[in-house]
Amino acid sequence: MNWQNKVVIITGATTGIGKATRELLFDNGCTVYNFDIIEHDDKKGSFIKCDVRSRQMIRDAVHQVFTKEKKIDMLFANAGIHLFANMEETTDEQVDDLVTLNILGTFFTVQSVIPIMKAQKKGSIVLMGSDQSFVGKGSSSVYGLTKGAIGQLTKSTAIDYAPYNIRVNCICPGTIDTPLLHKAVDRFATITSKPQLEVLESLNTIQPLGRIGKPKEIASVVTFLLSDENSFMTGSLVSADGGYVCQ
């Protein structure tokens, strides 16, 4: 695919999967905008400070991109947080944080770009799901709730906007070597008094491929989902999890 002059917004693209996707799209010739609260430390794309928990910040950031570029071709709504806790261990504040960022932040980001893509009569959107969009895991009640919601948001939005040639798909990674994973590992190690290396090794052994994934491996799938080469695919939840959910 010719990526030249394609304009893409990625939320949460300073670290992890968002960063890997930003770098890959930039290297392929895209004009990339990173909406994040922490600025990236390289020159691969433009940074706009945006906390996706704020509806107004999202709308202002999208307006800033559209004013400059006159179009928005693609969106990867990636920003999110993880929480390793069961229901009794979860505070009211943590529930609010996860729902506001993972669900509402995604919803309002998509809502802000949809009118632009409708006017263009074309657009491609990828939402960040999880293996927990398909299966349950222990100590993940609120996080799993948010990722199940993202799966349904993907399907409903895909149906609503297919007549406008806007495709909406969902990438559902498994266990990936990101800062979010290491925070979860740290918390689990603290709770269980197990060494962090032991926890990480246990994560490797439960994957059919025998290892956790790398951000670049997910970025390559996201890039395909965003691309015009994927023009007949919409409303799909795509696993990239080393075979975890098929066990």
Question: Model-flagged regions — what are they?
Answer:
Residues 86-87, 91-99, 189, 203:
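Substrate-binding pocket helix/loop in short-chain dehydrogenase/reductase
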Residues 130:
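Residue(s) in the substrate-gating loop at a strand-loop-helix junction
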